[in-house]
Amino acid sequence: ALIDGDPVQISMHSNLIYSAFDPRFNVVSLPFLFESVEDADAKLDGEAGEKLKAILDEYGLHCMGIAENGFRQLTNSRQEVRSVDDMKNLKIRVAGSNLLMECYKRWGADATNMNWSETYTALQQKTVEGQENPLPAIDAASVQEVQPYCSMWNAIYDCLFFCINGDIYDSMTPEQQEVIDECGRLATQYEREINRAGDDEIMNRWQNENGVTITNYEDMDIDSFKQAVDGVDEWYQKELEGQGYDDAKELIETFTKEAVS
């Protein structure tokens, strides 16, 4: 509907949603791609983000800014996850992305995909033992009620594209476009601030009201997770090239440049 411009003219969706029709948007979800939220900001506001905006242009969408969904943190009902060994055969609901499924396979998990609307019941009944999502999404679905363990591993990041239908944008005067773009820039910056400000409150509430065990990044064997997915960038590049995306190597290299602290 956003592409057609009727009835939706402006929308905000994650890179995972857009990856359903163009797998190049999965590049944002490469494991341990971003060392920090500052690194994510620098890349998505810079050359890497411009490449994604150019891809959106191919579909008739003008991106006014890139906001944040956040790092996808891991929750489960079995045990505290500190290292890749703790992931073995853990039944985890994973978002519908071939890249994410490949990563969880390499981490040793028993990954499955299901609709998010069905996930709470599946977790409650222990049909699946865990899931991965940014904290606000987990909290909004009350998943903490049935998931006593949360690992803050910052493995995979989600962004949000704030887009307007390209034809509508092109019909505006240059002055109007300038206003739209500035509003988009300010809105996405503000959204990032709000999103990040809520994480500490969410974790404190989960611990105090739900008894959730929070395992912090610095208490985890992050290297064990990184080693398990070593080479997944090359796997992803071959996947893209196999589907005819000749810009795959350049796109990935733009995102995997040295981190900005």
Regions found by a protein language model. Give the residues of each.
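N-terminal secretory/targeting leader peptides
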Residues: 1-39, 48, 56-261
